[in-house]
Amino acid sequence: DDPTGAHRILVLEGAFEEGIGFDGITTAEAGHDAFLPLMIAAAQTARMKLGTNVAIAFPRSPMVTAQMAWDLAHFSGGRFTLGLGTQVKGHNERRYSTPWPSAPGPRMREYLLCLKAIFASFQHPGKPTYFEGEFYRFTMMAPFFNPGPILHPQVPLYVSAVGPYMARLSGELCDGLRLHPISTFRHTRDVIVPAVAAGAAKSGRDACGFDLVGAPFLATGRTDADVEQARNSVRKQIAFYASTRSYHGVLAHHGWEDTGLELHALSVAGKWTEMPALITDDMLEEWAVVATYDRLADAVRAKAEGLFRTVTLTLLDEARRDVDLMRDTLRRLHQD
């Protein structure tokens, strides 16, 4: 086994990030499983929250997800947050061998309700709470298979969202919402926030404590020249995401439908190098925080304050060479 592999790196990363002031660390389900690294990180950290950002829901049954989440909640001392996403049809069918029988929203709704029923049954073995829906059912919980109660049974639930349906669903049933980076600041303010509030009102909840997690792109560097180079890199990322038709609702909100169609056509033709030029400076400002390191904290606050409760930031490469730089940025972000 390679001791310098991805999971070994995550162990070191978690302890390092906690030490310089990050409030939490999250894992994406990309090349590796989203859950296993967090068990490792939980053993190496004491304070920071640990979450999936996000785990793909449908390839796993609610019971499989619930068991992993329950163990992580217990082992981490209540620091685990469960973030779930649907992915798109092609990935479910062609990569995960998972059927896509209908629109994902109603299925995610049942998935969350089923999870809640399973968690309640774990915590109260003598009084199981069952669930039966169109897509998911949980109607059996023998004592032998019940992990039993834990000290922190309220596992915070998050879903990823780009459109209003999932945003309403999160407001109704979840503790938070993890925005996709394709969500612009204006689309979030105009579409996502009202949808979350509507979902919270439907369930009689107060949305004030809801954790709306933003994930803006960062175009940053030590000098203005570094920032300009980072802007070009971010344009490539934005162009890639904006070429996906599933995300064109965000572009339509800004009147950028034609840009989305052109980006999609270029991607189909394999003309990837031509795509970033379609992302204008005005577009970039709606998707990204652009600033040198010394102005980054103020720039993030200017874009995020009053909109996001939590902001996901990628650990800056410079931080490994200049820890004080990252620590100071985080300190200023934490200031009231």
Question: What residue spans do the PLM features occupy?
Answer:
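Active-site-adjacent structural elements that line small-molecule/cofactor binding pockets in enzymes
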Residues: 1-336
